[in-house]
């Protein structure tokens, strides 16, 4: 028979008495001592708790605990105002004394140890996280290997067709044809992953835009296209097809940037031109292939992606337009071949002819000059200002005339003799020398 809790000690004693009567006087003698100990322990614990609750409730003289509007029974559960006494801890100790004879104490120690054992496996997943990171890196490498054969198929189709179709689009970007030399170096992209820019352009030119959201596939495309292109002209043609269609941020030339800012219709105009002069634009990429130098093109690409970072999210129209005009001149200098000059002419003509556009440089300069000149003209032309000037002049003239009249009046008063300017009269009593000098001698 297991010893029950202290509050059930009476029932346990009754059960023990029944068992003792059944077992005999010998068993009764063995059971009575532990039962008596349990009864004494239970009564002592209950009496101590009752005494602590009713009589020995600590009073905090310095705190404001007694000022609360709670009854005395609830004040035992509340904290003291000054924080000097922790009565809940004392009550917890007393409850622990009640349950001290129970075996629950051993059980309570085991769950206290369990969280420590659980903490160790919690630490293991954090250790597994770095293990997952190396797994991601090899995951990218097999993707590159698997997608390399996929790109050649697209590459083969582009090399056969883009020598005319994609090279035709090079009219919009002849300088981008120079990018192939830099693709091997994994050149710029706004997210600081250099190969992404050129690779995104490659996917768009091939028409497979569904692969754009996967950065791993784009990395594979960049690596696959660069080794497979032994001849620079073919790669130049492929990249020419890729450059006109990109988001204008990945392209290394600023001409596509100038295209969307004046009007978005320029982008469809480029593919139309590409379809029309297929044979004429095909020699364009070959000429670009004759002049590819990786160092010079790296410099041009580094200069240009910095501008698209500011140009892509730019909300201001005036500043990005200034930037577009400067890179247009740079592109014209770098461009090689007649197709390049032809491509540079339409964007140049568009901003010139796009004077009606709201955000062009010409309009901005005119607005600034007008802002500086209009206020001056308006001040002189306003009737209110003229009336104010006239009235002020009249009032000033009247005031001056009034002052002059006052001065003249004062002068006239002096001349009329408002106060007499007479010669001073001799004093009535004057000192006269005696006629005779009389000397008196004492």
UniProtKB/Swiss-Prot annotation:
Alphabetic keyword roster: Cell membrane, Glycoprotein, Heparan sulfate, Membrane, Phosphoprotein, Proteoglycan, Transmembrane, Transmembrane helix
Subcellular location: Cell membrane
Record GO cellular component, one term: Golgi lumen
Membrane topology, record value: Single-pass type I membrane protein
Stretches with biased composition (Acidic residues): 63-77
Residue numbers on the Cytoplasmic membrane side: 409-442
Feature: compositional bias, Low complexity: 156-173, 225-238, 275-286
Keyword DNA repair (UniProt): no
Pfam families hit by this protein: Syndecan (PF01034)
Post-translational modification comment from the UniProt entry: O-glycosylated within the Thr/Ser-rich region which could interact with lectin domains on other molecules.
Residue ranges of the region described as Disordered: 1-24, 57-87, 150-173, 225-326, 340-367, 419-442
Known tissue expression: Expressed in the nervous system, the adrenal gland, and the spleen.
Domain of life (superkingdom): Eukaryota
A biological process from GO: cell migration
Compositional bias annotation for Gly residues: 13-24
Glycosylation sites per record: 80, 82, 84, 91, 108-110, 160-162, 169-171, 314, 367
Stretches of the chain found on the membrane's Extracellular side: 1-387
InterPro entries: Neurexin-like, Syndecan, Syndecan/Neurexin_dom, Syndecan_CS
Ranges annotated as biased composition (Basic and acidic residues): 433-442
Biased composition (Polar residues): 288-299
Modified residues (Phosphotyrosine): 409, 419, 431, 441
SMART domains for the chain: 4.1m
Subunit structure and binding partners: Interacts with TIAM1. Interacts with PTN (via heparan sulfate chains); this interaction mediates the neurite outgrowth-promoting signal from PTN to the cytoskeleton of growing neurites; this interaction mediates osteoblast recruitment. Interacts with MDK; this interaction induces SDC3 clustering; this interaction induces neuronal cell adhesion and neurite outgrowth.
Role description: Cell surface proteoglycan that may bear heparan sulfate. May have a role in the organization of cell shape by affecting the actin cytoskeleton, possibly by transferring signals from the cell surface in a sugar-dependent mechanism.
UniProt family annotation: Belongs to the syndecan proteoglycan family.
Protein name: Syndecan-3
Gene that this polypeptide is encoded by: SDC3
């Amino acid at each position: 028979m297991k010893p029950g809790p202290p509050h059930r000690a009476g029932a346990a004693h009754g059960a023990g008495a029944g068992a003792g009567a059944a077992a005999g006087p010998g068993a009764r003698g063995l059971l009575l001592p532990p039962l008596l100990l349990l009864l004494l322990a239970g009564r002592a614990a209950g009496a101590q708790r009752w005494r602590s609750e009713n009589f020995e409730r600590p009073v905090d003289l310095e705190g404001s605990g007694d000022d609360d509007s709670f009854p005395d029974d609830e004040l035992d559960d509340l904290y003291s105002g000054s924080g000097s006494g922790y009565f809940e801890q004392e009550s917890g100790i007393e409850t622990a004394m009640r349950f001290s004879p129970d075996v629950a104490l051993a059980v309570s120690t085991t769950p206290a140890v369990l969280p420590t054992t659980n903490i160790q496996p919690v630490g293991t997943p954090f250790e597994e996280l770095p293990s997952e990171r190396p797994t991601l890196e090899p995951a990218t490498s097999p993707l590159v290997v698997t997608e390399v054969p996929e790109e050649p198929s697209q590459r083969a189709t582009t090399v056969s067709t883009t020598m005319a179709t994609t090279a035709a689009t090079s009219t919009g970007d002849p300088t981008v044809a120079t990018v192939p030399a830099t693709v091997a170096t994994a050149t710029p992209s706004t997210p600081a992953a250099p190969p992404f820019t050129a690779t995104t352009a490659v996917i768009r030119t091939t028409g497979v835009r569904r692969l754009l959201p996967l950065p791993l596939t784009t990395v594979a495309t960049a690596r696959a296209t660069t080794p497979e292109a032994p001849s620079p002209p073919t790669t130049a043609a492929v990249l020419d097809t890729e450059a006109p269609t990109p988001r204008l941020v990945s392209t290394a030339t600023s001409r596509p940037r100038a295209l969307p800012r004046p009007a978005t219709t320029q982008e469809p105009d480029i593919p139309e031109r590409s379809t029309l002069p297929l044979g004429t634009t095909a020699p364009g990429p070959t000429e670009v292939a004759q002049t590819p130098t990786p160092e010079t093109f790296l410099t041009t690409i580094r200069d240009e992606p910095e501008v698209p970072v500011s140009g892509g999210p730019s909300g201001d129209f005036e500043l990005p337009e200034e930037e577009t005009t400067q890179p247009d001149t740079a592109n014209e200098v770098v461009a090689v071949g007649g197709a390049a000059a032809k491509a540079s002419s339409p964007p140049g003509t568009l901003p010139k002819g796009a004077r009606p556009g709201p955000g062009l440089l010409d309009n901005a300069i005119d607005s600034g000059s007008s802002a500086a000149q209009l206020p001056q003209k308006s001040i002189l032309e306003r009737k209110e200002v003229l009336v104010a000037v006239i009235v002020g002049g009249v009032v000033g003239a009247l005031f001056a005339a009034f002052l002059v009249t006052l001065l003249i009046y004062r002068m006239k008063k002096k001349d009329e003799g408002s106060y007499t300017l007479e010669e001073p009269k001799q004093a009535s009593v004057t000192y006269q020398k005696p006629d005779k000098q009389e000397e008196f001698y004492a």
